[in-house]
């Protein structure tokens, strides 16, 4: 609604489905708006530095990326209906999502763990560390070609998104990326070393002092960032009318990587993905999972 009303937008990640992300790109471009995908990672020095080192060959030929996401939530959520707090427009909060009874475990931060509104921890945290992974792999406007995953969802409470997971992606350039739960971290492994960190925003680590102290020289790849943060970058672009450092198409691509994992877990088999056409190859059921979901009442997208 905001984009169609002529507003520039900074929007928290992720989109709800793959096709919703495609519609978002079309809407931003149709109305010529500035759109910033909101994850702060591209302004965090350790992730910017990590991606630049990988892109400039400091670890040799990139072979594997290992991503670990935190274990969230820590409980299944209480579905017991509660009175809607005074002054809270719960119907507006639900928007196009299905009607459901109010409970505090459904709203605010906790919406992330309910599949009517989000894709769980893989989407919530994956949009952070998968973006760094795709940035370093030079696939930020593309994606993997194959996904294989196992996992299970929360049961017995309010939450229904993925709880346990083991995901492997394969890219056309031969790089593989794995994703498992644990202490949030990312590691790029190449033919001549590795670089990464253990812990959110934790200090950079590498297989050698030479990699850690390496300088990016003239003529090498420089990745655009803004140390003053995503909000400053967005405001600068509102004035300049240029794309911000995390524009709508790149935001959509990293959300897609997250959705691919959830779909592969639900399908229970290896999936082939065409990142150019943005469709699964030979799997109609998986493609159906990419759809824009029907809206509630007068709410609709498209």
Locations of the language-model features?
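C-terminal helix-rich "cap/oligomerization" subdomain common to oxidoreductases
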Residues: 34, 160, 236-302
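Non-transmembrane alpha-helical segments in soluble domains
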Residues: 25, 51-54, 94, 130, ...
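Basic phosphate/pyrophosphate-binding loop/patch that engages nucleotide-derived ligands
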Residues: 26-33, 49-64, 73, 81-85
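Beta-strand-loop-alpha-helix segment that lines the small-molecule cofactor/substrate pocket
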Residues: 1-43, 57
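Active-site rim elements
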Residues: 37-39, 115-123, 151-156, 217-224, ...
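Rossmann-like dinucleotide-binding domain that binds NAD(P)(H)
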Residues: 91-173
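Core domains of carbohydrate- and sulfate-ester-processing enzymes
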Residues: 66-106, 290-292
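NAD(P)-dinucleotide binding in Rossmann-like oxidoreductases
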Residues: 157, 165-228
């Amino acid at each position: 609604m905001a984009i169609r009303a002529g507003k520039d937008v900074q929007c928290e990640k992720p989109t709800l489905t793959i096709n919703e992300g495609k519609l978002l790109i079309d809407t931003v471009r149709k109305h010529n708006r500035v759109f910033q995908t909101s994850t702060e990672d591209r302004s965090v020095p350790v992730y910017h530095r990590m991606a630049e080192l990988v892109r400039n060959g400091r670890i040799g030929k990139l072979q594997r990326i290992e991503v670990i996401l935190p274990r969230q939530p820590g409980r299944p959520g209480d579905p017991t209906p509660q009175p809607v707090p005074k002054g809270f427009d719960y119907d507006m909060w639900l928007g196009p999502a299905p009607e459901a009874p109010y409970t505090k475990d459904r709203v605010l931060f906790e919406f992330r763990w309910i599949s009517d509104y989000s894709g769980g921890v893989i989407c919530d945290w994956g949009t952070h560390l998968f973006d760094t992974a795709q940035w370093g792999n030079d696939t930020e406007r593309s994606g993997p070609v194959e996904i294989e995953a196992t996992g299970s969802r929360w049961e017995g409470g309010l939450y229904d998104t993925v709880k346990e997971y083991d995901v492997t992606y394969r890219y056309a350039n031969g790089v593989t990326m794995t994703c498992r739960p644990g202490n949030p971290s990312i590691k790029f492994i190449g033919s001549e070393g590795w670089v990464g960190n253990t812990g959110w925003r934790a200090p950079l680590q590498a297989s050698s002092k030479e990699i850690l102290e390496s300088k990016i020289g003239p003529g090498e790849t420089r990745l655009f960032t803004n140390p003053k943060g995503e909000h400053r970058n967005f405001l600068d672009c509102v004035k300049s009318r240029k794309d911000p450092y995390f524009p709508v198409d790149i935001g959509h691509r990293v959300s897609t990587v997250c959705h691919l994992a959830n779909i592969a877990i639900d399908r229970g088999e290896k999936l082939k993905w065409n990142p150019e056409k943005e469709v699964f190859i030979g799997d109609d059921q998986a493609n159906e999972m990419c759809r824009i979901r029907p809206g509630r009442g007068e709410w609709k997208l498209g």
